[in-house]
Amino acid sequence: MATHKSAEKRSRQIEKRRIRNVSIRSKVKTYIKSVLTAIEAKDKEGAQSALQQAIPVIAKAGAKGVYHQKTASRHISRLTRKVNAQVAE
């Protein structure tokens, strides 16, 4: 347990950020899963619309530091490639 005021404050800040980050990570995973589900169901329009909804959420998580920026970009890139491959079929 923290004994200094600054350590107690830092502990509170860390806990608040952890809770926020868990929420954002869960949201990102949900959006990714919706895109992948649409791809598996061979739903081209559904996959494209799900991707368009997922991209800003993933990008924002990268910008906020929840994910590393390159990790967010990699998620977006891979999802986009999968959707484009399905549309091309």
From Swiss-Prot:
One of its GO terms (molecular function) is small ribosomal subunit rRNA binding. Transmembrane segments: none annotated. One of its GO terms (cellular component) is cytosol. Disulfide bonds: none annotated. GO terms for biological process: translation. SUPFAM superfamilies: Ribosomal protein S20 (SSF46992). Keywords: Ribonucleoprotein, Ribosomal protein, RNA-binding, rRNA-binding. InterPro entries: Ribosomal_bS20, Ribosomal_bS20_sf. Belongs to the bacterial ribosomal protein bS20 family. Binds directly to 16S ribosomal RNA. This is Small ribosomal subunit protein bS20.
